Amino acid sequence: MRLQLIGIGRTKAGAERELTARYLERAGQAGRAIGFPSVELREIEESRARRGDERKAQEGKAIRALLQPASLIVAFDEHGRSIDSEGFADCLGQARDSGKAMMHFLIGGADGLEPALTESAAFVFAFGKMTWPHQLVRIMAAEQIYRAMTILGHHPYHRA
C-alpha cells in the first residue's frame, strides 16, 4: 500500500521542511519491508480566496484532484478523535491488509479541511484537543506515520 501525505501550503526551507522530509524518508525505508513501498508528500498551494468557506472549497477541489479512486482516506482535523500511536499503527496495518493500493492522509490549511472531505474519510483523527498550526501538524503526521512503520515492523524506535 502506497502512502501519500497531502498538505495545504508549501513548506518553506527550514526546520519544518527538514523534519517532515526526515520522518517521511525514514517511514519509506521502514515501510518497504512491511508492505508500504512508498511514502510521499504532496503540497497544494493555499487558496487566496477572501472567505474561509471559499478557501476550503478551492483547496478541497485541489485535494480531490490528487485522490486515487478506491483509496483509503485519513483526515487530520481538530474535531477528529484522538488515538494513540499503537491504535494508529493498527489502523495502517488493517488498511494495508484490506488490499487497497493507496492511503491518503489529508491536512487542511489554516481554515481546516472542506467538510465533504472529512465526511468521506474512513478515519478522522485529531492530535489532541488543542489547535495546531497546519505546518506543525504535517511534521506530527509524518512522525506518526514513521512511528507506525516501526511499531508494525517491531523496531525499537517506539518504546511504549
UniProtKB/Swiss-Prot annotation:
HAMAP family hit by this protein: 23SrRNA_methyltr_H
Top-level taxon of origin: Bacteria
Catalytic activity: pseudouridine(1915) in 23S rRNA + S-adenosyl-L-methionine = N(3)-methylpseudouridine(1915) in 23S rRNA + S-adenosyl-L-homocysteine + H(+)
Official protein name in the record: Ribosomal RNA large subunit methyltransferase H
PANTHER family according to UniProt: METHYLTRANSFERASE, RIBOSOMAL RNA LARGE SUBUNIT METHYLTRANSFERASE H
Gene from which the chain derives: rlmH
Top EC class for this record: transferase
EC numbers for this chain: 2.1.1.177
Pfam families hit by this protein: SPOUT_MTase
Higher taxonomy: Bacteria, Pseudomonadati, Pseudomonadota, Alphaproteobacteria, Hyphomicrobiales
Gene Ontology molecular-function annotations: rRNA (pseudouridine-N3-)-methyltransferase activity
Protein's job: Specifically methylates the pseudouridine at position 1915 (m3Psi1915) in 23S rRNA.
Residues annotated for S-adenosyl-L-methionine binding in this entry: G108, F127, G128, K129, M130, T131, W132
CDD domains named among the record's database cross-references: RlmH-like
